[in-house]
A protein has these predicted regions:
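Glycosyltransferase catalytic domains, chiefly GT-A lineage
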Residues: 1-227
Length: 227
């Protein structure tokens, strides 16, 4: 049933235990086509090119590795395969994967959200430097970048390439103070780095997302977050 889905995960430090738990959970559901990456698997060329950003402990370089590993794997899969990236700290129920398959009967991508406002969780520079500085973006729902499904096609490859390219700019990706001299949006809480960038691109391209709660995608972590 799930033979067209290829799972991709990443873990470092204390997250490796969660990755193993997710792996076992997925096998029990029937998802056996899996690739699990750790920081030890990242190529030297990546570590060298992104060494400055990777030096930030939060998200192990604000999760810049995420668009990188997704892009590499997306290019390598077969044309009829679905690449489904899942954060190691997420534990989706079987019903979730059934919904993913239904989605791919109509679309060649899958994004989800949890109902949070994008403007509250994105610093102003990320809007400004991506030419997204208006109410359309502030008021939109933010994606949950912990689960991303993509079929191999030029549109999706170019989307992830853009995501990675914007992530190279630390003024867009990181929590560095805004250089635009503009205040954050009202009710701003915190910047969501890779997720904020992906959401801007998602809105710009007029894509569609699905809302899921913790009853369908459970939290898979009970230790201090140490990368």
């Amino acid at each position: 049933m799930y033979d067209k889905i290829k799972i991709l995960t990443f873990a470092k430090g204390n997250f490796i235990e969660s990755q193993q738990k997710l792996k076992n959970h997925l096998v029990s559901i029937g998802l056996t086509n899996q690739k699990h990456i750790t920081d030890k698997d990242l190529p030297e060329s990546f570590l060298s090119e992104y060494s400055e950003i990777l030096s930030f402990k939060k998200g192990y370089g604000y999760c810049i590795w995420k668009p990188f590993i997704i892009l590499e794997e997306l290019k390598s899969i077969g044309d009829d395969e679905i690449l489904l990236y899942i954060d190691s700290t997420d534990l989706p129920e079987k019903i979730f994967f059934d919904e993913v398959l239904k989605n791919f009967e109509q679309r060649e991508y899958f994004f989800l959200n949890r109902g949070y406002n994008h403007g509250q969780w994105t610093k102003r520079d990320t809007f400004v430097l991506m030419d997204c500085d208006n109410q359309k973006y502030y008021n939109h729902v933010q994606l949950e970048a912990g689960v991303i499904g993509l079929k191999k096609n030029n549109f999706n490859i170019e989307l992830v390439e853009e995501w990675l390219e914007y992530a190279k700019n630390k003024n867009i990706l990181t929590e560095h103070p805004n250089i635009s001299n503009l205040p954050n949006v009202n009710n701003f809480v915190e910047h969501r780095y890779d997720q904020s960038i992906l959401t801007n691109l998602f809105i710009k391209k007029n894509l569609v997302s699905h809302r899921f709660g913790t009853e369908v995608i459970k939290y898979n972590y009970n230790q201090p977050k140490i990368y």
